[in-house]
């Protein structure tokens, strides 16, 4: 394993997550990247090294802190981007090993700490983020967790199709432990 302080300050840094059943993901210290089983089955939008760190449509976990605002546990809010490389930047640490990573982020402004551990399940069919939020304030805070992961749910061949139209051609069913995406029509 290895550890890096403020990993979001290193350009081009990303790691693999993979399982034995074919799920392959790339993940950055801010949870950017993609997830797929092959070139025809992407859960998240396909990315290249050029847009790996610039794509905003990716895994995210937000905390709405009553009376204070919104904080991204991944470090990608506009406020966090603005504070990067200043003394207001969140303290963050990336610890990683073979096919997993743990991102720890601390916000002085919001008095919160997040710990996000990312890996693929042993059976290799599910990408998992275990998220722990700790209140560092002396006082009780009302925090509402918000998960935001835009599902691409189609082939890399569809990357240039009109996104709104192709997303309308999906049937999405909410399940107890996630969502199921079924394309009903695709363009060739």
Residue ranges and their predicted role:
Residues 1-188:
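Anionic coordination/interaction segments
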């Amino acid at each position: 394993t290895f550890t890096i302080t403020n990993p979001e300050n290193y350009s081009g840094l990303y790691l693999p997550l993979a399982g034995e059943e074919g799920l392959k993901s790339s993940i950055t210290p801010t949870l950017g990247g993609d997830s797929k089983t092959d070139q025809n089955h992407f859960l998240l939008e396909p990315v290249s090294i050029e847009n790996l760190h610039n794509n905003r449509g990716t895994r995210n976990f937000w905390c709405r802190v009553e009376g204070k605002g919104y904080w991204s546990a991944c470090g990608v809010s506009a406020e966090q981007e603005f504070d990067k490389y200043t003394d207001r930047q969140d303290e963050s640490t990336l610890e990683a090993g073979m096919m997993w990573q743990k991102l720890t982020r601390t916000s002085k402004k919001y008095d919160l700490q997040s710990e996000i551990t990312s890996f693929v399940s042993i059976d290799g069919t599910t990408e998992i983020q275990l998220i722990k939020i700790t209140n560092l304030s002396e006082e009780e805070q009302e925090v509402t967790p918000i998960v935001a992961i835009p599902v691409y749910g189609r082939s890399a061949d569809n990357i240039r199709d009109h996104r709104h139209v192709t997303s309308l051609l999906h049937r999405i069913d909410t399940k107890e432990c996630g969502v199921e995406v079924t394309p009903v029509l695709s363009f060739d």
